[in-house]
């Protein structure tokens, strides 16, 4: 029996009954959601694979000695950063252009010609690049917080290479800037790349201050409208989630409302704690392990399981 490729593709297709299957799949691939069908033309969507490459390129620019060329020297660092950043921003510009085109198709903005979209993509790419020095400053404070806050940490290199919380906050700070620039899909893909790598789920909309430290990290969830101050430390399996979801007169969820906790400066939240709703945890407070909290607490509070009373729970907890 010959194993060589067969040239008669029609015969192969018929042997598996593929004609009807391919036709059905081709029709289904246009997308069943009505608001996605504003154009009869196919358009390139953002690529998760490409964005993963972009993120790791950006990380090598932010921490070149650890994630850049292993042969990097003091003399070649400047060139490496410039060259890598140029290549990475070109890739990002294309992904931004694709999201803008998707927004145009789904929202029907009439003025969005290809030339206009390309110009807008370039402007957003430039704005993102301008934010990188501030992102680097914040990340340096995060790394320092991890080193000072974990007695097991032996070096900065160990933290950068081995701490999932640092990987998560690195990608989050990049995702948050994309979110601020009106690129929610790229931001969300970035967050999911981070989630897949670290087990830490931070929505790109969450606003997080400097010197932030997630220790261990597995199972941490931080919701879209969370506001977290400076020098906050949280441990594994902490949830900063929503308590309930308001609906409009048609029964549809009302999106975009503030529904997640506000964590003020210098707060520590220990493993397994669940904080739900638009509550405020006052500055310098400590939330003990496995606490279930649905009410605000003043500055300087120490909340343990023994102090928590039974609170009414509404649907959607922890999301």
Swiss-Prot record:
Pathway: Amino-acid biosynthesis; L-cysteine biosynthesis; L-cysteine from L-serine: step 1/2. Its EC number is 2.3.1.30. GO terms for cellular component: carboxysome; cytoplasm. Gene3D superfamilies: Hexapeptide repeat proteins (2.160.10.10), serine acetyltransferase, domain 1 (1.10.3130.10). The keyword Repeat applies. It is found in: Cytoplasm. GO terms for biological process: cysteine biosynthetic process. Transmembrane segments: none annotated. It catalyses: L-serine + acetyl-CoA = O-acetyl-L-serine + CoA. Pfam families: Hexapep. Keywords: Acyltransferase, Amino-acid biosynthesis, Cysteine biosynthesis, Cytoplasm, Plasmid, Repeat, Transferase. Induction: Transcriptionally induced in the absence of sulfur, requires CysR for transcription. Part of the srpG-srpH-srpI operon. One of its GO terms (molecular function) is serine O-acetyltransferase activity. Belongs to the transferase hexapeptide repeat family. This is Serine acetyltransferase, plasmid. It comes from Synechococcus elongatus (strain ATCC 33912 / PCC 7942 / FACHB-805). The lineage of its organism: Bacteria, Bacillati, Cyanobacteriota, Cyanophyceae, Synechococcales.
């Amino acid at each position: 029996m010959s194993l060589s490729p067969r040239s008669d593709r029609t015969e192969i297709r018929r042997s598996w009954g593929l004609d009807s299957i391919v036709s059905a799949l081709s029709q289904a691939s246009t997308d069943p959601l009505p608001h996605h069908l504003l154009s009869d033309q196919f358009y390139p969507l953002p690529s998760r694979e490409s964005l993963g490459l972009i993120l790791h390129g950006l990380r090598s620019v932010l921490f070149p000695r650890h994630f850049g060329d292993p042969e990097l020297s003091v003399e070649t660092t400047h060139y490496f950063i410039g060259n890598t950043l140029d290549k990475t921003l070109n890739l990002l510009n294309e992904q931004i252009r694709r999201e803008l085109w998707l927004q145009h198709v789904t929202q029907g903005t009439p003025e969005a010609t290809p030339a206009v979209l390309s110009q807008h993509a370039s402007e957003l790419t430039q704005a993102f690049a301008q934010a990188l020095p501030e992102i680097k400053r914040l990340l340096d404070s995060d790394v320092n917080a991890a080193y000072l806050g974990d007695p097991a940490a032996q070096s900065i290199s160990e933290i950068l290479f081995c701490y999932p919380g640092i990987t998560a906050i690195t990608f989050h700070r990049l995702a948050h800037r994309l979110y601020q620039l009106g690129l929610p899909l790229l931001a969300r893909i970035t967050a999911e790349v981070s989630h897949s790598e670290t087990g830490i789920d931070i929505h790109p909309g969450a606003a997080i201050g400097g010197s932030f430290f997630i220790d261990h990290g597995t199972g941490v969830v931080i919701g879209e409208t969370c506001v977290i101050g400076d020098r906050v430390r949280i441990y594994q399996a902490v949830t900063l989630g929503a308590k309930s979801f308001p609906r409009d007169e048609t029964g549809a969820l009302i999106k975009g409302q503030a529904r997640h906790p506000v964590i003020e400066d210098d707060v520590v939240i220990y493993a397994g704690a669940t904080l739900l709703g638009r509550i405020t945890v006052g500055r310098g407070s400590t939330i003990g392990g496995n606490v279930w909290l649905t009410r605000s607490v003043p500055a300087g509070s120490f909340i343990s399981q023994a102090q928590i009373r039974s609170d009414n729970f509404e649907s959607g907890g922890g999301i």
